[in-house]
UniProtKB/Swiss-Prot annotation:
Location of the region described as Basic motif in the Swiss-Prot/TrEMBL record: 218-247
Compartmental location: Endoplasmic reticulum membrane
GO MF, any single term: DNA-binding transcription factor activity
Glycosylation sites noted in the Swiss-Prot or TrEMBL record: N418
Region (Disordered): 71-111, 339-428
GO cellular component: endoplasmic reticulum membrane; nucleus
Residues annotated as domain bZIP: 216-279
Main localization of the protein described in the UniProt heading: endoplasmic reticulum
Highest classification ranks of the organism: Eukaryota, Metazoa, Chordata, Craniata, Vertebrata
Protein's name in the database: Cyclic AMP-responsive element-binding protein 3-like protein 4
Organism: Xenopus tropicalis
Amino acid sequence: MLLGSLFEQTEELFHSEGFPGPDHSNFPLSELQFPAEKLYEDWPVRGPMGLSEREDTDEFLQMMINPNEVYSTGPAAAESPESDSGFSDDPRPDTPPQSETSPPLPQPTPVYELVYDIGSLEERKSQSDMSSVISIQLAEDWNSAPLLIPESCIVNDLPPVCKSTPLPIRLTPADLIAVDALYPELHLTEEEKRLLSQEGVALPNNLPLTKAEERILKKVRRKIRNKQSAQDSRRRKKEYIDGLESRVAACSSQNQELHKKVVELEKHNISLITQLRKLQTLIKQTSNKAAQTSTCVLILLFSLALLVFPSYSPFRSRPSASQEDSYRPTGVISRNILNKGGFSEVADPQASDTLHRAQQREEGDPGRHVVPPANPNPEETEPVSNRARTTPEPDEQVLAEPEAAILGQKGEPPGSDNLSKTARADEM
């Protein structure tokens, strides 16, 4: 394992075809220490460990590691700015000079340490004292075997590493505010802290966070949001179900009350129907015959009224008995009848006809009183009488006498007497 690690380091430090040239800027080691350039392929391998002679091992280790540069001071480090050995270029003023090779002591057992790298002072501040030193401890059995480590590299004690004292830093309130603004504090809830502790993640108190920490924090917060949304949905569902249950209870109670009212109304309706049927039976038993007789009587009276009413008129005036018995002659004999020839003619032929018919009726029925028809136009008598007076006839006197006799026989009322008297006076 030791040879493998050493050969790997040689492959990294040296080019496969040798060094680029004898330029000291490219390879600062002196030619006195390296008399000739040797390739890795030309190295002789003898024995089981690869090298049998002590001188060859010294040359090999001197080619790999320069002990003078390991513990060199400032000028030695400044001469090799482009060194490929991997050592730090920073000066180390506190490093003690290189210790010479010490022979191995029989007691105590010597410890061989190979110093591979020493970090810079900045790395030493942040890390422990021994973190930048890699040592290989060899047991005492290696004394008998040929060693690859030169005696110049064997030291009994590790070189002391200086510790830098921290400088006091004074911050003003403005600087503190600026720092707080630049790196705000990370506020976490109790639920987030609990979930982070379950995840086994410890987040810093200040921002910013790394991508992995931000991813974990987002995951935790998403879990919390999902949990809260699930709780809200369950709460709303429970409230909705409680509201439905309350409504169902109210509707069921109202339904029971309405059912009771319906039953009561049905009972009342049945009682009313029974009462109505009883009343109908009573009316049929008592009023069937009476209703039939009354309707018949009403129909009979109405028919009689229709028959009697047209012939009976109480508002029509009846002629009086005096008007029925009175008789007014249509013609009057003038006093001038005898003055002209002794002949008289009837003034009106219609009047003579009526008188003749009246006489015939009296002869046929002496007990009946004949009423002469009334003259519809009484004004016609007046010019006839005037004509009779102007043209008297000799026969008027002869006709007037039997007419007066006829009227006297009938027993006319006193008005008729006056008329006859006036007629006689006119004749005189």
